[in-house]
């Protein structure tokens, strides 16, 4: 089979590889759509995961079951599925508390185990979810959307009927837009998208979102006006800039992945006096079913975030250089 393979740190190739054997409890998935995420780039450069090279990247993927092991009864050949990539141990302190995304030895398809940038992928059957007739390119958004769901749950959005009056999201890339659209779907009347790129803001506006230029004087005048503010850029100064914009009693969600050594300055008295909630969110925590439910109703608009659907042979450049076109959003491998 053809696959993108990270053969060593910083080196990705298009390879011809054998299809792996099918162990008990597993299914062979014929990959139909697989999305590129910045985490894939971090894996390539050994900034994320345990540096398990060689490895096939890709943790946002959907496909058709091609075969199942003899002990698998839940799925059969021909079933249409999406993959939950996280592989927690199930026994550590975090797993016992239900925080599988914080597993002390967390593994994942596309990070420590071969993933979805290949024609076929061997996956544990209990990590598959049926997608019915949902288009594959839409279903492949389930994993990043599940990360969004985990973030909203961590922040208490929608829990016990709690819905902020308004929200602000920094970073009009695919994940930031997924978050903003999901906030709207939860009933938040006004969701504002902040970015420095005018074309991305225009796209966000076309999706029905309010927009603001990040770092602008106009935005700074909205101090203490947003009940919920999230950073989806992973840029520390942007994350720091959230705090003054949060309304009294509001919530700031650290959703983007800042560098491990990045630092921000926050006044503890301000958190205390204004009763602010600072919330972190990492990955997904068995949220694929909730993500699929959102895609059933909002999949058409969210699918607009998929800007490229390419064969494997055209995917490699997106792993090795940052796209210069701001119109590039979610790039997916689409089976020919």
Swiss-Prot record:
- Asked if the record carries the keyword Zinc, the reply is yes
Gene disruption phenotype: Deletion mutant cannot grow on D-altritol. Does not exhibit a growth defect when grown on D-galactitol.
What the entry lists under Pfam families is as follows:
ADH_N, Glu_dehyd_C
Taxonomically, the superkingdom here is Bacteria
Q: Which InterPro entries match?
A: ADH-like_N, ADH_Zn_CS, Glu_dehyd_C, GroES-like_sf, NAD(P)-bd_dom_sf, Zn_alcohol_dh
Identify the residues that bind Zn(2+) 2: 89, 92, 95, 103
Classification via PROSITE patterns: ADH_ZINC
Pathway terms, separated by semicolons: Carbohydrate metabolism
Q: Which cofactor does it need?
A: Zn(2+)
Q: What keywords were assigned to this record? A: Carbohydrate metabolism, Metal-binding, NAD, Oxidoreductase, Zinc
Q: What induces it?
A: Up-regulated by growth on D-altritol or galactitol.
A Gene Ontology molecular function term for this protein is:
zinc ion binding
What EC number(s) is this enzyme filed under?
Answer: 1.1.1.407
Task: Identify the residues that bind Zn(2+) 1.
Answer: 37, 59-60
Give the catalysed reaction(s), semicolon-separated.
Answer: D-altritol + NAD(+) = keto-D-tagatose + NADH + H(+)
Cofactor binding note of this UniProt entry: Binds 2 Zn(2+) ions per subunit.
Q: Which family does it belong to?
A: Belongs to the zinc-containing alcohol dehydrogenase family.
Q: What does this protein do?
A: Involved in D-altritol catabolism. Catalyzes the oxidation of D-altritol to D-tagatose.
What name does the UniProt record give this protein? Answer: D-altritol 5-dehydrogenase
Gene source species: Agrobacterium fabrum (strain C58 / ATCC 33970) (Agrobacterium tumefaciens (strain C58))
